[in-house]
Amino acid sequence: MKAVEPRFFSNGSVTRLETRDIDELAQYMKHADIELIQIGRTITPSSLTQVSFDKINLQVGHYGAPYISNATIDKDRSGMVYKVNKDFPTTCNGYEIDSASFMYYGKNSEHIAINNGLCRWIYISFKPDYLEESLLDPLGAKLDTRRNVSSHLRCQAQASLDSLYEIVNEITEFANSNPLIFHNTDVTKGMEWSLLDTQVLILSNTLNSSPKNTYRGKKSRESIIRQSIDFLKANSYEPIHVLDLCSALNVGMRTLYYAFREFFGISPITYLRLVRYAKARRDLLKADPARTSVTDIAAKWRFWHFGRFSVEYKGLYGESPSETLNKGMEI
């Protein structure tokens, strides 16, 4: 049988490879020194998609054959490995990975895995110290992040994991069908924000945590809400991520969450998303449709999945974003 040539694409921030030889993926994987050993017949082609963001790196792989994987994680970066499909068993570092569990790999730690069939996985690695300082600290979460240490973790909210898988699938689809969109920094920042949101939700439903600061009573939570509103007003012309808000107020994620749930009945992530919709609507009403597009404004406010943006926008305001844009010229 004639060998099938691998298909490879790279434009700097996005890399895509599809091949029949599973071990060929190893040379393209980032932030790990990895060896892949095939242990069964090839069922489908294998593939790897990589997207480099500012604070994190996303790698999505599909192994089209049973394999053994031996790897050493980058000495400067840590990360999370998730397995998406559950139709074949996978063992990582002696732990069976099921629908609610995933692996954390510290800097320079060992990854030893065996999979007995097809495997689709996600690896999210963080720039040096970002996980500890910008995710775990606001969450008040306890995780052993020492070098050479790995941990088997269990998430208590399947919906949080499913949200990650959905977002990663959408990003991967863009990488396959429209890779030039990754040259738009507003779009890539929006994608990164979505990935960070999923990590916040997953870790908050996985790790034991303690409040960074202790606030008791309605007065303290009222103060947090007032400070949040003041901060958002002072930065009204730029999108704010929930981690930025935690940092600005010097409060933990759990404290912020309880305050927003008490006063608004929604999480701070949802609140900030609604604020971004309101800002996008403001810009649509003010914009000249001859010079500005809906996608330009959506991307500015970190909405990168334009189909979802249109549907959710219409659900909020009873009209499509394009109708708002054209209506603005009539006012």
Q: What does each model-identified segment do?
A:
Residues 262-263, 315-316, 327:
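Alpha-helical DNA-recognition elements
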Residues 62-67, 83-88, 106-109:
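Short acidic (Asp/Glu) patches
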Residues 2-35, 39, 43, 89-236, ...:
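Alpha-helical bundle regulatory/interaction domains
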Residues 72-88, 124:
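Short, conserved beta-strand element in jelly-roll/cupin
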Residues 41-48, 56-73:
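Conserved short histidine dyad/triad with adjacent acidic residue
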Residues 256-260, 308-309, 313:
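Short hydrophobic/aromatic patch on the recognition helix
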Residues 62, 68-74, 92-94, 113-116:
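Short histidine-centered beta-strand/loop micro-motifs
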Residues 271:
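Cytosolic nucleotide-binding catalytic cores of signal-transduction proteins
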